[in-house]
């Protein structure tokens, strides 16, 4: 039997929807993750959460902090599973230097946007982010509501 190809939407493991609400995303970067076996199994089962995760730098390396990958109940018992451990990001030297310089500017941080599969590899989309003020969030909500209202008006106008 032929193997089915994954559709474009099937490869997403976890999304950080709050990131686009709380931050202006200026740049997006794709990074690999250094994972343990039980983490890959749990991610295949969809037990990952990156809602409050961000990137920290330590000794010239980048790490994902705050991501939670819940272990499966059928996972091996001889391995100690820490769901909230910091995971190393796999970036080349040039990408690390660029991100480190950009993230050290005032008001900027690196947040996790999405976790997904690319072929057989788990990838993390990182966003260079600047925090939004409350009035910026209100403007986004107004724009979104106006777009919905405009679409509704156009739909009714076409029915005519």
UniProtKB/Swiss-Prot annotation:
Pfam families: SmpB (PF01668). Belongs to the SmpB family. Required for rescue of stalled ribosomes mediated by trans-translation. Binds to transfer-messenger RNA (tmRNA), required for stable association of tmRNA with ribosomes. tmRNA and SmpB together mimic tRNA shape, replacing the anticodon stem-loop with SmpB. tmRNA is encoded by the ssrA gene; the 2 termini fold to resemble tRNA(Ala) and it encodes a 'tag peptide', a short internal open reading frame. During trans-translation Ala-aminoacylated tmRNA acts like a tRNA, entering the A-site of stalled ribosomes, displacing the stalled mRNA. The gene is smpB. GO terms for molecular function: RNA binding. It is found in: Cytoplasm. PANTHER family: SSRA-BINDING PROTEIN (PTHR30308:SF2), TMRNA-BINDING COMPONENT OF TRANS-TRANSLATION TAGGING COMPLEX (PTHR30308). This is SsrA-binding protein. GO terms for biological process: trans-translation. Keywords: Cytoplasm, RNA-binding. One of its GO terms (cellular component) is cytosol. Gene3D superfamilies: 2.40.280.10.
């Amino acid at each position: 039997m032929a193997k089915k190809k994954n559709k474009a939407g099937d490869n997403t493991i976890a999304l950080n929807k709050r990131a686009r609400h709380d931050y202006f995303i200026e740049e997006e970067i794709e990074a690999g993750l250094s994972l343990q076996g039980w983490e890959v199994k749990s991610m295949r089962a969809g037990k990952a959460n990156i809602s409050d995760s961000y990137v920290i730098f330590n000794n010239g390396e980048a790490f994902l902090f705050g991501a939670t990958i819940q272990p499966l109940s059928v996972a091996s018992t001889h391995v100690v599973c820490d769901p909230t451990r910091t995971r190393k990001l796999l970036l080349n030297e040039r990408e690390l230097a660029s991100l480190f310089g950009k993230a050290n500017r005032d008001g900027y941080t690196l947040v996790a946007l999405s976790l997904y599969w690319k072929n057989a590899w788990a990838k993390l989309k990182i966003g260079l982010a600047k925090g939004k003020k409350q009035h910026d969030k209100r403007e986004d909500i107004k724009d979104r509501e106006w777009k919905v209202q405009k679409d509704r008006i156009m739909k009714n106008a076409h029915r005519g």
